[in-house]
């Protein structure tokens, strides 16, 4: 019984030695089958791994997993550029009408009574405003003898102030070559050039004495003036005739006295004394012309010296008939 086992022992020992030897040399031993008898045992000696075989076929996809829980909200991203403005929406329906308010209390003075009170107590001239403490040059409301309000430019700076300006030329922005009706009613721009109106001139000068001042400024900046003791304009029925007082003083000299007692003329109404010629049309203005003029302050706005004769803003005793002034103002003040 022991003999087969004793015989097998050397064989196994030999195989183990061979295996060890094969591992040292790097070769893989073969698989050996030991014992073929019925009572013999089979011993398998493991060899070295060989090269991997080819990959097997792809398996079927597995069933999808369930949806995971929602993650935490991330931080907001950078704001994009603003979009274009949308179209305006349709107008909504009107709101509910409010309740009627309480009736106001009656005024102690009616419209007529209030106007009469203002007329009685209101200023009649720029000189009147000056005596009431108004010292700034500007536009103010005064009241005519018939109680109508009138907005006028008050010069509170020149020669003691209190002057009501009725003619102003400063930049040529207003056309002064106008018809009779325009000069009757007045025209111009409150901020630049204007003619107050012959009807208003008549009302302002009809009662009480008004002195006249003419202020002139050249394009080079030199200034001059002329002053007269009185100035009055008749009504339209007398063609707005000029009644002028004595020349008092002035660096511009006297170029208006020759026009005393003359009617006003425009290009469509010739009231001068120049025979068959219309001085207003001839010299492109409107004035108290005789045959024709020594002054023409409503003439064309020309840039200083000019070649044309006597059709600019001229004052003969100042710069002559061929020089047109940059600025001309005519103003009256109660004396």
Swiss-Prot record:
It is a peripheral membrane protein. Residues 326-335 are annotated as: P domain. Gene3D superfamilies: Gamma Fibrinogen, chain A, domain 1 (3.90.215.10). The keyword Repeat applies. Pfam families: Collagen (PF01391), Fibrinogen_C (PF00147). The record marks 309 as: Mediates specificity for sialic acids. Belongs to the ficolin lectin family. One of its GO terms (molecular function) is carbohydrate derivative binding. Glycans are attached at residue 271. GO terms for cellular component: collagen trimer; collagen-containing extracellular matrix; extracellular space; plasma membrane. SMART domains: FBG. CDD domains: FReD. Ca(2+) binds at residues 270, 272. This is Ficolin-1. Homotrimer. Interacts with elastin/ELN. Interacts (via Fibrinogen C-terminal domain) with FFAR2. Interacts with CRP; may regulate monocyte activation by FCN1. It comes from the Eukaryota. Residues 47-114 are annotated as: Disordered. Keywords: Calcium, Cell membrane, Collagen, Disulfide bond, Glycoprotein, Immunity, Innate immunity, Lectin, Membrane, Metal-binding, Repeat, Secreted, Signal. Residues 1-17 form the signal peptide. Residues 75-88 have a biased composition (Low complexity). GO terms for biological process: cell surface pattern recognition receptor signaling pathway; complement activation, lectin pathway; G protein-coupled receptor signaling pathway; positive regulation of interleukin-8 production. PROSITE patterns: FIBRINOGEN_C_1, FIBRINOGEN_C_2.
């Amino acid at each position: 019984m022991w003999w087969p086992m004793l015989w097998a022992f050397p064989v196994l020992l030999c195989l183990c030695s061979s295996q060890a030897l094969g591992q040292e040399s790097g070769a893989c031993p073969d698989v050996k089958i030991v014992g073929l008898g019925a009572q013999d045992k089979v011993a398998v000696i493991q060899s070295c791994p060989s090269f991997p075989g080819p990959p097997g076929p792809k398996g079927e996809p597995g069933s999808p997993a369930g949806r995971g829980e929602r993650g935490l909200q991330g931080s907001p991203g950078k704001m994009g550029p603003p979009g274009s403005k949308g179209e305006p929406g349709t107008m909504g329906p009107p709101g509910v009408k409010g309740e009627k308010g309480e009736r106001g209390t009656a005024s102690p003075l009616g419209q007529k009574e209030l106007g009469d009170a203002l007329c009685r107590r209101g200023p009649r001239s720029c000189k009147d405003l000056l005596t009431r403490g108004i010292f700034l040059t500007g536009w103010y409301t005064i009241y005519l003898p018939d109680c109508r309000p009138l907005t006028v430019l008050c010069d509170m700076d020149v020669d003691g102030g209190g002057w009501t300006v009725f003619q102003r030329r400063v930049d040529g922005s207003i056309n002064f070559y106008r018809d009779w009706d325009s000069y009757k009613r007045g025209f111009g721009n409150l901020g630049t050039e204007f003619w107050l109106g012959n009807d208003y001139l008549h009302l302002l000068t009809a009662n009480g004495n008004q002195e006249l001042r003419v202020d002139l400024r050249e394009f080079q900046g030199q200034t001059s003036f002329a002053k007269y003791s009185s100035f009055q304009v008749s009504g339209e029925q007398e063609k707005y005739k000029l009644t002028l007082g004595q020349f008092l003083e002035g660096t511009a000299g006297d170029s208006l006295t020759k026009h005393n007692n003359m009617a006003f003329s425009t290009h469509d109404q010739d009231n001068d004394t120049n025979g068959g010629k219309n001085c207003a049309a001839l010299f492109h203005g409107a004035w108290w012309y005789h045959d024709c003029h020594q002054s023409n302050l409503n003439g064309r706005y020309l840039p200083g010296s000019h070649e044309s004769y006597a059709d600019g803003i001229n004052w003969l005793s100042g710069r002559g008939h061929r020089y047109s002034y940059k600025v001309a103002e005519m103003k009256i003040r109660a004396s």
